[in-house]
């Protein structure tokens, strides 16, 4: 069975219904132009993702998460993946600064949901419902992904606020299971989210690497400690 490898993870077939999702220590930014390797990053992302998937499952969100296979590996359900990313934004940051006349850090009165087509070659362009239909994704499917994404946002915002963290924005991916249900997939980690400390607005995510803001592993360890309540064993 074929192993699928991306920039940050490997998907290793376990059987007809499951994959091992292995998180790598590699970090990339700006469409792969900036690259580095950080020992322990894969372990931290796997453990943080597992914690957040469990939290969401406890709140009734269907995810592909099955269990932890140890270290930097999770066991996940095999899905038919949609070729889009759903981004939810609570605070102005990143590319949103270029599209709205609002300062960085401005707290939005309501979340913004955006759709992006997954394509390295096209640099993940933003799309809308019309584009999605051309890609074979119905309006009903998009609306269900948006509904789930907003529910995820509601759960995670509250959880992170209690840990002294602002959930600035995040990216989700979805797939369809054998029952035809739309299921949350991929990962939820500091690689795919923006997290700021409530008091200092210090980044606790991949922006630390992207913009040379400090030590990436120390930022990820700090996030882990706040979420899990103990020192990471790496």
Curated annotation (Swiss-Prot):
InterPro entries in UniProt: SAICAR_synt/ADE2_N, SAICAR_synt_PurC, SAICAR_synth, SAICAR_synthetase, SAICAR_synthetase_CS
Bilayer-spanning residue ranges: none
Taxonomic lineage of the native organism: Archaea, Methanobacteriati, Methanobacteriota, Thermococci, Thermococcales
EC number(s) reported in the record: 6.3.2.6
First-level EC class: ligase
Superkingdom: Archaea
Catalyzed reaction equations: 5-amino-1-(5-phospho-D-ribosyl)imidazole-4-carboxylate + L-aspartate + ATP = (2S)-2-[5-amino-1-(5-phospho-beta-D-ribosyl)imidazole-4-carboxamido]succinate + ADP + phosphate + 2 H(+)
GO terms under biological process: 'de novo' IMP biosynthetic process; cobalamin biosynthetic process
Annotated family: Belongs to the SAICAR synthetase family.
Annotated pathway: Purine metabolism; IMP biosynthesis via de novo pathway; 5-amino-1-(5-phospho-D-ribosyl)imidazole-4-carboxamide from 5-amino-1-(5-phospho-D-ribosyl)imidazole-4-carboxylate: step 1/2
UniProt-recorded name of the protein: Phosphoribosylaminoimidazole-succinocarboxamide synthase
MF-aspect GO terms: ATP binding; phosphoribosylaminoimidazolesuccinocarboxamide synthase activity
Keywords noted in UniProt: ATP-binding, Ligase, Nucleotide-binding, Purine biosynthesis
């Amino acid at each position: 069975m074929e192993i699928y490898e991306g920039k940050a993870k490997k998907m290793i077939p376990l059987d007809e219904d499951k994959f091992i999702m292995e998180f790598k220590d590699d970090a990339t930014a700006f469409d792969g132009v900036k690259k580095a390797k950080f020992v322990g990053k894969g372990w931290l992302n796997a453990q943080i993702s597992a914690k957040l998937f469990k939290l969401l499952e406890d709140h009734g969100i269907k995810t592909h998460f099955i269990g932890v296979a140890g270290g930097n590996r999770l066991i996940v359900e095999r899905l038919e993946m949609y070729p889009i990313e759903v981004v939810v934004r609570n605070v102005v940051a990143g590319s949103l600064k270029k599209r709205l006349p609002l300062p960085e850090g401005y707290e939005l009165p309501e979340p913004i949901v955006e759709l992006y087509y997954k394509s390295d070659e096209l640099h993940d362009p933003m799309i809308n419902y019309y584009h999605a239909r051309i890609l074979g994704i119905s309006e009903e499917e998009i609306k269900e992904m948006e509904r789930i994404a907003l529910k995820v946002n509601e759960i995670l915002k509250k959880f992170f606020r209690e840990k002294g963290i602002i959930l600035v924005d995040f990216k989700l991916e979805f797939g369809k299971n054998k029952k035809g249900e739309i299921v949350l997939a991929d990962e939820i980690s500091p690689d795919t989210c923006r997290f700021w400390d409530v008091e200092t607005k210090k980044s606790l995510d991949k922006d630390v690497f992207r913009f040379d803001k400090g030590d990436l592993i120390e930022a990820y360890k700090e996030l882990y400690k706040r979420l899990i309540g103990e020192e990471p064993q790496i």
